[in-house]
Amino acid sequence: MQIYPLRFVPNKIDFDFMNFKKVSYSFSIILSLISLIWISIYKFNFGIDFVGGIVIEVRLDQAPDLPKMRAVLSALEIGEVVLQNFGSERDLSIRFGSSSEENLMKNIDIIKTSLRNNFPYNFEYRKVDFVGPQVGRQLIEAGAMAMLFSFLAIMVYIGVRFEWYFGFGILIALVHDVILALGFMSMTKLDFNLSTIAAVLTIIGYSVNDSVVIYDRIRENLRKYHKKNITEIINLSINETLSRTILTVITTLLANLALILFGGKAIHSFSVLVFFGIIAGTYSSIFISAPILTMFANRKFNKKVITQGKG
């Protein structure tokens, strides 16, 4: 019995992606500008990792239902609330941001009242402390520099594996993806915390992987079809990898959707941001990082790429 691979597009599809190059560039520039303007006006909803907050240590008479307790406290609309065990199962740490001193005692009372009304436990409040942010200004700046150097390292890697202009294409796509992800985070008021930084790094990794698959096919087709121009080769390469691209994005989105629906509040911001970033990364790999190579169509492609390839 012959087994056929799963495909979402016909084998001989010949969609003219390059015909939409100017439209996709304009669309991406507009979205990026909107994101930057929105961020400059409305900023981010910084989580307690960045702004500090209050820690309440409490002991219960029995092990609590943590998922239900997280859901109840998250519904109080007092900002991000982090609930976790420390020591034994009956010892809890409740951490939340302090937006202003006036609301400090009020929010503590709201939490205590909510716990008392919704759970049949005996609560022994042991300590209430103010804690500073886990992520200081210097660490934020160091993280930004690390991301910048990661961009440069990726560009160098792609340049060594392919050619320098391939690295330039991926760099533009990554900057596009990060700007859109940050804009989306600002618009949707997702908590900006350590998990969302991890989400941005995940988006970068996914976008690079998606672009490299198309670049590999472009390099292969440059060696196979010497008489085709670069626009035809890019179109052909995108179409040949389209089934793989669609299959990958669907399976990844489905896995991420499970995290959004069942992962709970603790990873909600991470899951939602990665979901958006996967879509943005797929779009940029097809409509930005590959078409941008046509900027170099008037220069002679390095013969080593066409005849031998690198890596």
Swiss-Prot record:
Keywords, in A-Z order: Cell inner membrane, Cell membrane, Membrane, Protein transport, Translocation, Transmembrane, Transmembrane helix, Transport
GO cellular component: plasma membrane
InterPro entries according to UniProt: SecD/SecF_arch_bac (IPR022813), SecD/SecF_bac (IPR022645), SecD/SecF_CS (IPR022646), SecD_SecF_C (IPR048634), SecD_SecF_C_bact (IPR055344), SecF_bac (IPR005665)
Subcellular location: Cell inner membrane
The protein's assembly and partners: Forms a complex with SecD. Part of the essential Sec protein translocation apparatus which comprises SecA, SecYEG and auxiliary proteins SecDF-YajC and YidC.
Family of the protein in this entry: Belongs to the SecD/SecF family. SecF subfamily.
Name this protein carries in UniProt: Protein translocase subunit SecF
Organism name: Rickettsia prowazekii (strain Madrid E)
